[in-house]
Amino acid sequence: MDFPPLLEGRLLRRYKRFFADVELPGGEQVTAHCANTGRMTGVCEPGSRVWLQPSDNPRRKLRYSWVLMEPAAGELACIDTGRANALVAEAIAAGRIAALAGYAGLRREVRYGAEGSRIDLLLEGDASGAGRADCYVEVKNVTLRLADGDGAFPDAVSARASKHLRELMHVVAAGHRGLLCFHVAHSGIRSVRAAGEIDPHYAATLREALDSGVEVLAVGPLQATAQRWLCGAELPFTPPAR
């Protein structure tokens, strides 16, 4: 994904989940929209370098959207969770994710399940000749980096994330593929695991989902700059203990 020209600034504060005050190079202070509703541990530190996307849409309440930040020297994190599905879909279409290659069609935000959910990506029509079932892909954005370099999800208790795992289990029971894709949006993360210390119920549900046949894949950036973000580097995933 190529970004439009972004404005670099310095983060002053993130507050009320959806707002971030940023100082631009000339000293102007602006308020940007923050799409990430999680705790954003480690990726919303005041003083960090950030990149904003401006908009000329007069209907927007906030002119700027917060897209990237620099958690440490030489690292970038894409904190705009609204881009995760598009980045994974782009990688699938380009053939960069082998486990999800060979499908004829891809649809987004399709209603499914017993709990009124929408699947992020639905891959249909096996074009490989291998006779694979349709694949329901749930995408989760990972920006929480632990001290050892592991990425962990979720960064806060998430009943919704556990619900999505239950829906994937139902999909598998019905004869389809159900796959949880951890989209690693932090260039410093080297592997992924469930954050059982933050949300033990999610970790237990993920263990149950794995035992039920749900697949898990972690993919990180092949390229991460303020001009381009390419998803598709498969990363190790450590399953929760039984």
Specify the residue positions occupied by each region the protein language model found.
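Conserved hydrophobic positions within beta-strands
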Residues: 9-11
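Short, charged beta-turn/beta-strand-edge "cap" motif at the junction between a beta-strand
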Residues: 13, 54-59
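Short aromatic-glycine-enriched beta-strand elements
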Residues: 16-21
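Short nucleic-acid-contacting surface segments enriched for D/E, G, S/T with interspersed K/R
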Residues: 37-51
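Short, Lys/Arg- and Gly-enriched loop/turn segments at beta-strand edges
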Residues: 57-68
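Active-site metal-binding core of divalent-cation-utilizing nuclease and nuclease-like domains
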Residues: 75-82, 93, 97-143, 163-166, ...
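Nucleic-acid nuclease catalytic cores
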Residues: 149-159, 166-198, 220
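Domain-level recognition of nuclease-like catalytic cores that cleave nucleotide substrates
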Residues: 186-242
